[in-house]
Amino acid sequence: MSVLKKNRRKDSDTPQEPSEKAKEQQAEAELRKLRQQFRKMVESRKSFKFRNQQKIASQYKEIKTLKTEQDEITLLLSLMKSSRNMNRSEKNYMELRLLLQTKEDYEALIKSLKVLLAELDEKILQMEKKIANQKQIFAKMQEANNPRKLQKQIHILETRLNLVTVHFDKMLTTNAKLRKEIEDLRFEKAAYDNVYQQLQHCLLMEKKTMNLAIEQSSQAYEQRVEAMARMAAMKDRQKKDTSQYNLEIRELERLYAHESKLKSFLLVKLNDRNEFEEQAKREEALKAKKHVKKNRGESFESYEVAHLRLLKLAESGNLNQLIEDFLAKEEKNFARFTYVTELNNDMEMMHKRTQRIQDEIILLRSQQKLSHDDNHSVLRQLEDKLRKTTEEADMYESKYGEVSKTLDLLKNSVEKLFKKINCDATKILVQLGETGKVTDINLPQYFAIIEKKTNDLLLLETYRRILEVEGAEAEIPPPFINPFWGGSALLKPPEPIKVIPPVLGADPFSDRLDDVEQPLDHSSLRQLVLDNYILKENRSKEVRGDSLPEKVDDFRSRKKVTM
């Protein structure tokens, strides 16, 4: 509404009022905005109301739980303050004092017995040391009194020393050879490193030259294209010049043939005319000089005809200019011919260089292919390694699943035992985030409560037995029975501990060496050591096999007790 009032004030302030349609449109737009705001406010109100209802319900639940806890606490306080419970607690207090007194007496007795046992153990150790010393002294005396055995032992030790020295000398010689080989290999490595550096430098230089050759080949190709275009233009021009030259030669030949025919005709006519006039005078002279005159006339006439033709060819009538033009054309043609031959030679050289570069490119491609193959082999090895690691990870995950299953079973058994012996879990449930189930975090706390409960039960059982003994005044004390649901009958009675004294006899290995009369080599000594090692392994396996059934029986008895 305030927005409408403001709009009305603005409309009243404007000097020119808008039309009714514009006013209706503005009013409808304002109405839409107000409806949207109203819807948003209704939705926000609903959400706020829903959250408040949830908070109130949760607070009601907390109030109920607190009331129930208050009722339980008041009930416990009333029970604790009752006279019956007070008397019982006093009675339990007296019983516990008595039990603690007996416990202290027994602990003092146990300490004294432990001290006595420690003294006896020390005496036993001293006696064993004395017996061992006496046996060693006796054995040494026997060996000292047996010179044959001593001689044999000395001979065996000398042979061993000889073999060891020979082996040591061999090792020294091989060590010296290996040192020499290592030094040689070091020198070779230095030489190979130098060669490698040189080859690396050469490779870099070859790469640079290859790049330059590629650039030059590209430039040469461009120049070749230009030269080919020039050659094509020159060939076209040459064809045109040759065609023009052929036409001119044909025209000159035609003119020469016509003039020669005309000259022959005139000569014939002239001869016929003068034949009658000078027949008598020059008959002999003509006969003698006929051939010479004829040749001279023909050469002169041919010169005249050639001179006339050259004059016709010359545009300005200057023969020197015609000769200079002809010589210039010949020089240009000769220069063009030499340029074309040089271009052909350059093209052949560039073709050879491109062929050599193509061979080098093929070689580099083959090397690149080999490097790609090596990379593929390395990738295959890495894939195999990844596959093995994934298999190991899957195996460890399966083991983790099995261990988690066994841990869940143990948690369930602990929870059952906790409920079965009626242990109090209020200390654990008070903590934050506890739901009353056994987890990895609160498992030690459950174990501590179970241990405390078992100690209390054992104290009660011992107090009950003391009362029974005092009441019955029996001479033979009754056997100890576990209070946990009669499970002690299933336990195996403890067997007496067998103390096996150490055998102080001679070593079988030394006995075998004593039995051997001849000196031993390396292979026979190795065989004796292997036989001795196999005997020791068999004895340890037998001892383990004897102790394994006892461990199995102990594990079964413990399992029955826990069940």
UniProtKB/Swiss-Prot annotation:
Annotated keywords: Coiled coil, Differentiation, Spermatogenesis
Disulfide bonds: none
Stretches of the chain forming a coiled coil according to its record: 18-201, 233-291, 341-422
One GO location term (cellular component): axoneme
Biased composition (Basic and acidic residues): 10-29
UniProt keyword Transmembrane present: no
InterPro entries in alphabetical order: ODA-DC/CCD, ODAD1_CC
Region Disordered: start-end pairs: 1-29
Keyword Coiled coil: yes
Any one GO biological process: spermatid development
Chain segments annotated as transmembrane: none
Signal peptide, first to last residue: none
PANTHER family: COILED-COIL DOMAIN-CONTAINING PROTEIN 63
Function: Plays a role in spermiogenesis. Involved in the elongation of flagella and the formation of sperm heads.
Name of the molecule in the record: Coiled-coil domain-containing protein 63
Origin species: Homo sapiens (Human)
